[in-house]
Swiss-Prot record:
<dbReference type="InterPro" id="IPR005955">
    <property type="entry name" value="GST_Zeta"/>
</dbReference>
<dbReference type="GO" id="GO:0005737">
    <property type="term" value="C:cytoplasm"/>
</dbReference>
<dbReference type="GO" id="GO:0016034">
    <property type="term" value="F:maleylacetoacetate isomerase activity"/>
</dbReference>
<dbReference type="InterPro" id="IPR034330">
    <property type="entry name" value="GST_Zeta_C"/>
</dbReference>
<feature type="domain" description="GST N-terminal">
    <location>
        <begin position="4"/>
        <end position="81"/>
    </location>
</feature>
<dbReference type="InterPro" id="IPR040079">
    <property type="entry name" value="Glutathione_S-Trfase"/>
</dbReference>
<dbReference type="InterPro" id="IPR036249">
    <property type="entry name" value="Thioredoxin-like_sf"/>
</dbReference>
<dbReference type="GO" id="GO:0006749">
    <property type="term" value="P:glutathione metabolic process"/>
</dbReference>
<dbReference type="InterPro" id="IPR004045">
    <property type="entry name" value="Glutathione_S-Trfase_N"/>
</dbReference>
<protein>
    <recommendedName>
        <fullName>Glutathione S-transferase</fullName>
        <ecNumber>2.5.1.18</ecNumber>
    </recommendedName>
</protein>
<dbReference type="InterPro" id="IPR034333">
    <property type="entry name" value="GST_Zeta_N"/>
</dbReference>
<dbReference type="Pfam" id="PF13417">
    <property type="entry name" value="GST_N_3"/>
</dbReference>
<comment type="function">
    <text>Has a glutathione transferase activity with ethacrynic acid and nitrophenyl acetate. Has low glutathione peroxidase activity with cumene hydroperoxide.</text>
</comment>
<comment type="similarity">
    <text>Belongs to the GST superfamily. Zeta family.</text>
</comment>
<keyword id="KW-0808">Transferase</keyword>
<dbReference type="GO" id="GO:0004364">
    <property type="term" value="F:glutathione transferase activity"/>
</dbReference>
<keyword id="KW-0963">Cytoplasm</keyword>
Amino acid sequence: MATAKPILYGAWISSCSHRVRIALNLKGVDYEYKAVNPRTDPDYEKINPIKYIPALVDGDFVLSDSLAIMLYLEDKYPQHPLVPKDIKTKGLDLQIANIVCSSIQPLQGYGVIGLHEGRLSPDESLEVVQRYIDKGFRAIEKLLDGCDSKYCVGDEVHLGDVCLAPQIHAAINRFQIDMTKYPILSRLHDAYMKIPAFQAALPQNQPDAPSAK
């Protein structure tokens, strides 16, 4: 009996969904993608009570939070390891991933931007988001000072790269960040855009993207 494909609930524009798509692609997992708007779809709460995306349904197991999903995938699918074996390299890689997941992305999301509605103009809201992104990018740029490897912590893609790539993409395409301030991150972005697994995961390449309709 064939095993059912895992189902990824997400949205084209979500950088959290974007990073999980990259991880699934890198590991060669055949999955089903279901687009969802967690703010308007009442049924999604049955899958994820906190109503954030993404969520992964793997048989009778449901998991939400992109970092938890990627670590689950890492354990279930050993091909193309995303977590380095060396403990210091692993520590740096996880630090980069967590800066993105904890200190940048949550502060640019709809939940936070929505708090500004009525109090700040769109331009003022954008400036707030840009400050958060710039703060995180400055930190990562310093952490990677002197980095001469192909990717964040080596010549293979790891978890930090998987988290960083969507954040840089959003910074450029949604939040008008001047990437000339971040030469290392700009170089990494160029490297990511050459990888088929990253290209396939891009927001504009998803079936729910406006460009796909």
